[in-house]
Amino acid sequence: MSFTWPLGNAESQLEFYDLSHPWGHGVPAWPYFEDVKVERLHGMAKSRVLTQKITTVMHSGTHIDAPAHVVEGTPFLDEIPLSAFFGTGVVVSIPKNKWGVVTAEDLENATPEIRPGDIVIVNTGWHRKYADSAEYYAYSPGFYKDAGGWFAAKGVKAVGTDTQALDHPMATAIAPHGPAEHLGGMLPWAVKEYDCLLYTSDAADE
């Protein structure tokens, strides 16, 4: 059985692109998050209705972060107007490898040009590694702080990317920040490897 829903005149003039990864039980999760759980409470065979119970952290799969996720006293998702999620979109390709950093210079030189009011998607290529893996989370590229300043100064509407977060993993709880600071990070082995890489690079520069 298949269903179709007709589009109105306004929607029929637009192109829609689904950028979401599949979501459900077993979706890749941050190292300290519980798995998504989907339970069937009623099924067609027994109850003639389908009722499901979903237990999840909202910060899972392809999602939007509200400012309140990281900055105290800022808006939650329900406090942001719907108009903030619609507008002109631009996808820029800025390939990065393991622990790469997206900088303001990268954004300034990106094509097509990023304009004020754009919703910007930065494609680092890391979506190809999306999985329940140490590589996707621990070795991910991230944005340098000057990139955030560049976005703000440019006046973009929203920013999306294909990495585990906008932040570099070594600026998250994977490293000694936040909930796992006293443990040396959620993934201390990754922190040790990163520190060794920095030490080796510094020694090579001398």
Label every PLM stretch briefly:
Residues 93-133:
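Glycine- and Gly-Pro-enriched alpha-helical subdomains that act as flexible
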Residues 169-186, 191:
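Histidine/acidic-residue-rich catalytic or RNA/ligand-binding cores of hydrolases
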Residues 64-102:
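A glycine-rich, hydrophobic loop/mini-helix early in the fold
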Residues 199-204:
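Conserved small/polar residues in nucleotide/adenosyl-binding loops
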Residues 19, 63, 92, 120, ...:
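Divalent metal-coordination and catalytic microenvironments
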Residues 1-47, 157:
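Generic N-terminal segment detector
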